[in-house]
């Protein structure tokens, strides 16, 4: 996702343009916006509300320079999983202000407790969305550097942006063909990650242990993450 997030911001931003980024955030999103000449404007994700985005805070931070909003769902670093109704509110705001949506969904296969992951692009067929995912987390092969970005929705709104992406992508000359040869097998074959995210599985049990250990410390609280084993406490 890192290379593609950098690519996606470089193709979009002029100096001074703004992108809404969640806080707390995966810091490389802020870095990619900054490196592209933009300004990362952080919107609040509130622990008291299961770490969901504060929609009113998002609205307050939109200006005439705002070009896009980034969401990370499932979230890194909080482990929050955004429900359909929260995603719909974000879509409504993006539609009203004509914002592009960038959705980092690299943890979408690591959802626990029978919760459902909803891709925000499925709720916004009329908007231009860029969705990121890959095999690093779900298949535990980060060293292969296999990831992808999916452009969906109203591509007429992103014609110039797509041209910019193609130009920047061509500068890479070639992809990692040997690594890419495993994608079909990885996605279509046996999915071992399912054993890790259920009771008895390593990721599930790590989450349970750390969640309890944190909350057992006086003065420390943590919201139980719904995806992978990350957590943020206070």
Residue spans for each PLM region:
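Short, small-residue-biased leader/transition segments that mark boundaries at the very start
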Residues: 1-2, 233
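Phosphate-binding glycine-rich loop
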Residues: 3-18
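A short helix-loop-beta submotif of the ANL/AMP-binding
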Residues: 34-41
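Helix C-cap/helix->beta junction micro-motif
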Residues: 36, 96-97, 127
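Active-site phosphate-binding strand-loop segment of PLP-dependent enzymes
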Residues: 41, 46-113
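Conserved core segment of the aminotransferase class I/II
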Residues: 122-201, 211-213
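Conserved glycine-rich beta-strand-loop-beta hairpin in the small C-terminal domain of fold type I
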Residues: 184, 200-211, 221-231
């Amino acid at each position: 996702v890192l290379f593609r997030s950098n690519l996606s911001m470089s193709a979009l931003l002029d100096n001074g343009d703004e992108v809404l980024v969640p806080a707390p955030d995966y810091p490389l999103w802020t870095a990619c916006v900054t490196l592209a000449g933009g300004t990362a404007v952080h919107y609040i994700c509130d622990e008291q509300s299961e770490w969901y985005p504060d929609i009113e805070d998002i609205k307050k931070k939109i200006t005439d320079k705002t070009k896009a909003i980034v969401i990370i769902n499932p979230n890194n670093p909080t482990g929050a999983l955004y429900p359909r109704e929260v995603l719909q509110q974000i879509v409504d705001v993006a539609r009203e202000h004509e914002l592009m949506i960038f959705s980092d969904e690299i943890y979408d296969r690591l959802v626990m407790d029978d919760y459902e992951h909803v891709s925000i692009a499925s709720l916004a067929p009329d908007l231009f969305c860029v969705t990121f995912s890959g095999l690093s987390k779900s298949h535990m092969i980060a060293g292969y550097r296999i990831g992808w970005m999916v452009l969906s929705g109203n591509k007429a709104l992103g014609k110039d942006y797509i041209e910019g992406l193609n130009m920047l992508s061509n500068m890479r000359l070639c992809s990692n063909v040997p690594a890419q040869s495993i994608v079909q097998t990885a996605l279509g074959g046996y999915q071992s990650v399912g054993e890790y995210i259920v009771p008895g599985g390593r990721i599930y049990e790590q989450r349970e242990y750390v969640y309890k250990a944190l909350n057992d410390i006086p003065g420390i609280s943590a919201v139980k993450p719904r995806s992978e084993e990350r957590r943020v406490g206070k």
